[in-house]
Curated annotation (Swiss-Prot):
Keyword Translocase part of the UniProt annotation: yes
Gene source species: Streptomyces coelicolor (strain ATCC BAA-471 / A3(2) / M145)
Any one biological process term the GO annotation gives: transmembrane transport
Binding site for ATP: G38, P39, S40, G41, S42, G43, K44, S45
Domain of life: Bacteria
Official protein name in the record: Fe(3+) ions import ATP-binding protein FbpC
Gene: fbpC
């Protein structure tokens, strides 16, 4: 693995005796895009503020390019920070906002103008230099905030819920544009978000946090295919999670015997059954369930099932094959879509 541009070693922040950042170790390589994901209160925003120099550490350290950042004030750290609410200067036009960082670093007027023009072109707003920020749409404000964060050429760009205030269609479009832009510029990025789709679309690596600690770190594919534990699986939106006892190629679960892959770890575990692995069959076959709800997902219908005396299940059904609410159905399970997790929360 390439050396880290950013490194956190034992980073700890306490509020009133409670560790909101608890002995965190994390490295971000140069040109890597890392998204920190987690529910409210997991410590992800505190982590970002600690790296930016806005929140002092109670223990541990942050290094940037090998240099300890202890005692380095926020405005002297080589980082750019973009918040969810943009925080543009309302009294300045677009150019004035973008040029602020270079001007603070002593750039000449000509250099400022050239940088503004370059960045407006990059973020898709050519010719907007003299526009008032109050006249910009939400998406345009987001682009200007990004240009302002990039203007001083930071070693590290940090994004705090960068698309949180935008509508879904605009978020989905901008996350693709951001990914392309960061790849083109070779930008090193540390972003925090609570939106799983945003993180998985944007990141080279996803870090899931829980209660101030890192619950799992890996590529989007690794985290999606192999959640570390029940918390990560449920946070990613998987509902079919249960404790189980695995012996051979079967798991004894609240839903009865569930087939597992050949190489599945044995003993007391947690199993995840992906919705695609919950197969709806006639009511006289498999586990008997009642359809309690249906949710249209675009490419399929999520069918919510209530077995008798067992936790609810979610199945992914083809658009024209989904049973109606109230229908009695049977359920069988496909081993290929069953994931056996470590009982202790440690990935196998």
């Amino acid at each position: 693995m390439p050396p880290s541009l950013l490194s956190l070693e034992g980073a700890t922040v306490r509020f009133g005796g409670r560790a909101v950042l608890d002995d965190v170790g994390l490295g971000v390589a140069e040109h890597e895009v890392v998204c920190v994901l987690g529910p409210s209160g997991s410590g992800k925003s505190t982590l970002l503020r600690a790296v930016a120099g806005l929140q002092p550490l109670d223990a541990g350290r942050v290094t940037l390019d090998g240099r300890d950042q202890s005692g380095v004030p926020a405005h002297k750290r080589e980082v750019g920070l973009m918040f969810q609410d943009h925080q543009l200067f309302p009294q300045r036009d677009v150019a004035g906002n973008i040029a602020f960082g270079p001007r603070m670093r002593g750039a000449s007027r000509a250099e400022q103008q050239a940088r503004v023009a370059e960045l407006l072109q990059l973020v898709g707003l050519p010719g907007a230099a003299r526009r008032s920020v109050a006249a910009l749409s939400g998406g345009e404000q987001q682009r200007v905030a990004l240009a302002r964060a990039l203007a001083p050429r930071p070693r590290l760009l940090m994004l705090d819920e960068p698309l949180g205030q935008l509508d879904r269609s605009l978020r989905e479009r901008l996350v693709v544009e951001l990914r392309e832009l960061f790849g083109r510029l070779g930008t090193t990025v540390l972003a925090v978000t609570h939106d799983q789709g945003e993180a998985f679309a944007l990141a080279d690596r996803v870090v899931v946090m829980r209660d101030g600690r890192i619950a799992q770190s890996g590529t989007p594919l690794e985290v999606w295919q192999r959640p570390a534990d029940a918390f990560v699986a449920r946070f990613l939106g998987f509902e079919n999670v249960a404790e189980a006892s695995v012996a051979g190629q079967a798991a004894d679960t609240p839903w009865g015997k569930v087939p597992v892959p050949e190489d599945a770890p044995q003993g007391t575990r947690t199993v995840l059954v992906r919705p695609a692995g919950v197969r709806v069959v006639p009511a006289d076959e498999g586990l008997r369930c009642t359809v309690t709800a249906r949710t249209f997902r675009g490419t399929h219908v999520a069918v919510h099932l209530q077995p008798e005396g067992a936790p609810r299940l979610e199945a992914a059904c083809a658009l024209r094959a989904a049973p109606e609410v109230g229908a009695a159905v049977g359920v069988e399970f496909d081993a290929a879509d069953v994931v056996v997790l470590g009982g202790s929360g440690v990935p196998e």
